[in-house]
């Protein structure tokens, strides 16, 4: 692989180079040229990163035959003349930039051993010449080619003026003399008698040197032991005598690569001497000078080369080669076009175009660098001025340093706070530490951040709490309908604080189905108590640091949610709502957040809550914590034990209608600007909406459907207004165009007002136009239940619902079969419910054996029990009595009393045990139209707490044993 660099030499008066070692050369000139050779050898030749060009700093060209260190077998410093015609030369294929005559390039041969051997043999034969050609593909990194089509046909005949042979790498410094054209590849043929060119003349040369009247100075010592410099010179006569015999075998070498090629010299056409040529050359010279202004690195050398005394204007060929070597932004094909061209006029035009492009690129680069440098200098200047200004202000006492400002700010905060002694001690220690830290250090930022958080805690600050019960009751009733238990508990809380004459905290948990107002009631409570409100959700939280903060040694450390809350509300007695506490993430890599809440929600511990970031106890005993949850069974036991549980049940249809009238519809009228005169929703439409569209326990879905009605009505009114405005606009336009038309009357305007004032009434007949088809077409799955089908009552996170139990025979009962019967369950049942099935089967067998001893139904029957809606998981023990009734109904082949529902857990002896969710189940029974409901006797107290309107229209039967229910099962 080649690594190339270039050194610029003058090509004019090249014939003077042949006299470098002659006796008539002065010693001063010889020493000067030796110095130039030393300078050239000391240059660091460029690598793969691109070409670096160096220029001579003296007028005379560097003599390539002055003091060059040759191979040891080359003999003395006998000059070798460059042959005018040498057709067979080794081929060197390079990348990117062509090598033009009069210039130098460094080439390394690394991989190809055959090419290395050929170059070494040529050097030993004192034939240090080669042909350099540019590859067409810049990505081709091979050192040899397999076909001449891979390179451009025109290249340069070069002389190897310096060699560094390092074994694995052969470093060559090439000096180009003329342009050549590659004709065909040839095979390398080693002559039988390899005699050095100067071998036969060595003795004669030494004799001539001895008899010369002027002895030239001795050659200088070699520059480096590994450097071999070759600058052979032979006369034209000797070159003719020693012509190389052309090889007999030609052709492209596909496997080993082309390393030797037959060439011919490229002869340029005569230079036209006219004004156009001179003008073009002068334009080129001037453009080169302009380019040098933007790149001062080689400005002095180029200006010397372009000096009028050098007569560059008389050598257009060299000027074109100079331009091709100077340009750095040109493409390979553009440079090769100049190499191929033999018409000097065209070459000058190509050179002018290239140097003008280079000028544009150089100017753009210069402008960019200048802008960047200006910005850097301006920034540096501003920085220095700011630093000087700070020092001046500090000396004059106008401004204090950053540390003093921070400490004074902290002291101002402390004056308004009642900071405890232990916290004040930590603050003073950190202030002292801050004074000795460098403001630019990371520890300074950590300490300052810690002090800011520590002084942001509202130590001893509390907001005045409302203790007027009437005001609190009014605030709660205005925001929410119903929720009797919640409102009573808050009133009790206010009463206790009133009697204690102090501000206290509490930990409450509102649990119930979604959409019943658990989260919104918390904000109303904060308003009623005149406390600051802060909410954060722990649903899906998996990191303990969200609650207790990070260690402040961590990068980007922050305190937990409670400290952030205290900083925001600026009081020690806010109302903090912890939402979705039943959906908190489990224990993981970052700890267990549920366990972290234990300290926060424990009344005995939160008076000294320790955040990891502050590492100072903070009093949270005055905070009123309110948690919300849908299912309390998912809350960890220790955490549930620390909270006071308050059930927020679902709403009946009547309650939903009242909520819609008192809260939902007024709020939507305010949001949509639709007055009562524009839209009216009848009660029958609301009841239909609740019954067939929104059966959930909450009112969130009901709110969405009512909002949809308002949007449809708003669209209808807006369209009507646009239709009424368009005729009026057209009439106004017509009057403007025709001034003689009759004046417009106010009839259309009155009609528009009348149309816009028409009221939209939503009733049961047009409800589907606004909200679509009903989602629930029937209240119950069975209007008449067959044998084996019983309606039970279930309680889910969405509220109460009817749960049917279906029991059928898989095949007819064969009493003669010796095999026992079986039972199968489907419907996505949980483990507890599957156990209830087995328990119910045992109880049913006992009752059937008692009532009909001869009935062997359960011994031989293959029974299948299914609970509909199999996509919904079902679990729990409350379906025990329903399962027993279903099995007995199937065994006796008798349907139970219609419009009957039941719930309760069954024991193995038939005892009916209490269950939860009585309110939700009673609501579900009313919704599906059940008339008789069986409840466990121990749930009587829960039923008594229900409002009277909820108990009406229901025949409630309380049972303690299943026998009591069995007596009324088939009546």
From Swiss-Prot:
What stretch or stretches form a coiled coil here? none
Q: Where does ATP bind?
A: 512-519
PROSITE patterns reported in the protein's UniProt record: LON_N, LON_PROTEOLYTIC, LON_SER
The annotated regions of Pro residues compositional bias extend over 214-224
| Gene null: resulting phenotype | RNAi-mediated knockdown causes transcription factor atfs-1 accumulation in mitochondria.
Which InterPro entries does the record associate with it?
A: AAA+_ATPase, ATPase_AAA_core, Lon_bac/euk-typ, Lon_lid, Lon_proteolytic, Lon_Prtase, Lon_prtase_N, Lon_prtase_N_sf
What protein name is recorded for this chain? Lon protease homolog, mitochondrial
